[in-house]
Amino acid sequence: MFLIKLELLYHIMSKQQYRSEMGIMGDILDVTQNGGQQGVIVSAISRRANLSHYAVLDKCEKLIKAGLVETKRDDRNRKFRITEKGLDFFQEFKTFQNLLESMNLRY
């Protein structure tokens, strides 16, 4: 009986460590929103969203295709910044996120 409860606890705790893809996208949008008009480099997004460099690039490409983020190059870096559509989406996402949290649901 004790082993079953311990196994269940481990399963629940291990599930809580991971974010959904929407949660990750929300974190990236949050970082790019805070980056302002100058944009944010990949390493800053990686650090603030707690993602690998390659995961950031992969998710940012999806956000670019959806029109939520845009990219620009300056002298040395590729920078990402949130679009108007991205800002609108992010506001709705935060509202949805707050609703789920108020209902004790994970997204």
What kind of feature is each model-predicted range?
Residues 64-74:
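A short, conserved structural fragment
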Residues 2-14, 91-107:
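Amphipathic alpha-helical dimerization/coiled-coil segments
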Residues 16-55:
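N-terminal helix-turn-helix DNA-binding core of bacterial DNA-binding proteins
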